[in-house]
Regions:
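Conserved non-transmembrane functional hotspots
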Residues: 1-42, 77-168
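Hydrophobic, membrane-inserted alpha-helices
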Residues: 41-50, 65-69
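Hydrophobic alpha-helical transmembrane segments
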Residues: 46-65, 72-76
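Alpha-helical transmembrane segments and their membrane-interface exit regions
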Residues: 66-76, 93
Length: 169
């Protein structure tokens, strides 16, 4: 494997790790914030029903409350701390990958040293695969892309430049 190929591979795994980290954070954000919004909306609707008894007779209101309850039930499993813990592990691995990337980029040695870097990369890739969670909440992909390419550009610039990534195509 050449130095350029190794750098590209490190950046590729760095992207996957960063994406997995942001996806876990996105799932936790969506589940936590949406659950709170449902709770606040439920309290607001209950207060309206108390203040305006005519609303108690409207079946649309009942279907709305049922829909919000189903959404709350769907989001409940995603409020677990395992998503935050996984994101924190992936964040540490991403930092190690970033350090490895810059170490390889600065190194002008020959082939034997690249094998050591390749082994470090394999170890970090295995750690990343172990730390990631495959089950994520609906909408976390979109939110992850916004975080990765829009909100946190500085943190991801090293692999974005190497892989020539863009927000749209």
């Amino acid at each position: 494997m050449t130095k350029e190929q190794l750098l590209h591979q490190i950046a590729n795994i760095g992207y996957s790790t960063s994406y997995g980290r942001d996806k876990c954070y996105s799932t936790a954000d969506i589940a936590t914030k949406t659950t709170w919004r449902i709770t606040i909306l439920g309290v607001f609707v209950a207060l309206l029903c108390v203040l305006y008894p005519i609303l108690n007779n409207i079946s649309v209101l009942a279907f709305g409350v049922i829909g919000l309850t189903i959404l709350g039930i769907y989001l409940r499993p995603y409020t677990d701390n395992k998503y935050i813990e996984s994101a924190q592990k992936l964040e540490r691995i991403e930092r190690q990958l970033q350090n490895l990337y810059f170490e390889v980029k600065a190194n002008n040695e020959t082939e034997p040293r690249l094998n050591v870097y390749g082994q470090k990369l394999e170890d970090l890739d295995d750690q990343q695969k172990t730390a990631s969670i495959s089950s994520q909440v609906l909408g976390s992909d979109w939110y992850t892309h916004v975080k990765l390419f829009w909100a946190k550009k500085i943190n991801s610039q090293w692999f974005v430049d190497e892989l020539k990534l863009k927000f749209f195509f």
